[in-house]
């Protein structure tokens, strides 16, 4: 604080429910009251942050330093917010946290995510629940069977941030719990054979050799994710990885990213082509501005903002409507 005198007010992340009062007090104004969240992400879908912070110690990540350890929000509070968002028109809630499978552990809950989903299932008007993100360490058959049995409310589309596939690199990343990503994927597909999987990967982590990258690329080609994101490693100041030797040149990082993204583009195209001639529910989000009978939406394996959109033709469709097309 002393080193940043230009900062007028520090607001702890754990006290977000008090930010309004604190800001008003700092400005010498009265606080009008009311803490209902306003839906700003679109008329059909909303993000619901279920926890703050992270208990994992990945060496490339600064989030635990910035946001502290896991701090789960109470179920009652989340159900109230969910009800408010649905009342404003949201039909899909995207549960977000650094690790949604970890939800409730700091509150002494053994099956926190399951309890939360069961509580949210009572919210009238809610059609879909989507989970972002499931850390590999939390992926087990007990949870997967629950998610399978919670369909169609919980869509069988999961983002599992693996970050890499080679066990040596995963260990160097501080992710020994994820040393066998093949096993993680096999566990999911054993319980949910039709699940859509997406992941995020880091290329060019310090010490990543050509053999490590070739292993990762083969993994992507064999697993065939519906979608994935690839990020060149960035040396975040204050993280252990930033001081590691064997830093990979930027040009090599970018080239490796392009190679995997090229592989994934072909995989995603093949998966989408396999959907031709099938019917599935489309969550309508908005009309096309140029064609009055064309509407933009998403199917169950398309997460908001990152996995593309689906267009459906019709008359008088409304945002938030589920259309079987």
Locations of regions flagged by a protein language model:
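Proteins enriched for Cys/Gly/acidic motifs involved in redox and nucleic-acid/cofactor modification
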Residues: 1-103, 158, 179-187, 213-214, ...
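Short, hinge-like loop/turn segments at secondary-structure boundaries
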Residues: 4-5, 27-29, 111-113, 147-149, ...
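Short, glycine- and charge-enriched coil/turn segments that flank and shape catalytic ligand pockets
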Residues: 25-31, 105-114, 141, 179, ...
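Residue-level signature of catalytic and energy-coupling elements of molecular machines
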Residues: 50, 95, 131, 160, ...
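Generic beta-structure capping elements
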Residues: 53, 98, 161-165, 233, ...
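Conserved SAM/AdoMet-binding glycine-rich loop
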Residues: 87-211, 221-222
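Radical SAM enzyme [4Fe-4S]-AdoMet core and its adjacent flexible, acidic
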Residues: 104-121, 125, 172, 233-266
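Terminal RNA-binding accessory module
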Residues: 243-325
């Amino acid at each position: 604080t002393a080193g940043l005198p230009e900062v007028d007010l520090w607001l702890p992340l754990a006290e977000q429910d008090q930010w309004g009062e604190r800001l008003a007090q700092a400005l010498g104004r009265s606080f009008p009251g009311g803490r209902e969240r306003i839906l700003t992400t679109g008329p059909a879908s909303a993000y619901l942050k279920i926890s703050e912070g992270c208990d994992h110690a990945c060496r490339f990540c600064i989030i635990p330093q910035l946001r502290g350890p896991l701090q789960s929000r109470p179920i009652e509070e989340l159900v109230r917010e969910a009800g408010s968002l649905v009342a404003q028109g949201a039909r899909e809630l995207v549960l977000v946290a650094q690790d949604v499978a970890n939800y409730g552990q700091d509150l002494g809950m053994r099956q926190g995510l399951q309890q939360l989903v069961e509580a949210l299932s009572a919210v009238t008007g809610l059609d879909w629940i989507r989970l972002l993100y499931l850390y590999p360490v939390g992926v087990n058959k007990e949870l997967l069977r629950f998610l399978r049995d919670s369909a169609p409310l919980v869509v069988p589309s999961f983002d599992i941030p693996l970050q890499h596939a080679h066990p040596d690199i995963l260990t160097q990343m501080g992710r020994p719990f994820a040393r066998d990503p093949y096993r993680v994927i096999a566990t999911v597909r054993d319980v949910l054979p039709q699940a859509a999987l997406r992941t995020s990967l880091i290329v060019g982590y310090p010490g990543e050799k050509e053999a490590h990258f070739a292993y990762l690329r083969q993994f992507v080609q064999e697993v065939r994710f519906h979608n994935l994101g690839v990020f060149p490693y960035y040396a975040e100041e204050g993280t252990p990885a930033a001081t590691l030797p064997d830093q990979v040149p930027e040009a090599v990082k970018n080239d490796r990213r392009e190679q995997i993204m090229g592989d994934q583009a072909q995989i995603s195209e093949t998966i989408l082509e396999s959907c031709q001639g099938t019917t599935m529910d489309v969550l309508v989000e908005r009309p096309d501005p140029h064609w009055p009978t064309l509407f933009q939406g998403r199917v169950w394996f398309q997460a908001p903002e990152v996995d593309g959109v689906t267009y459906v033709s019709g008359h008088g469709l409304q945002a938030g409507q589920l259309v079987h097309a």
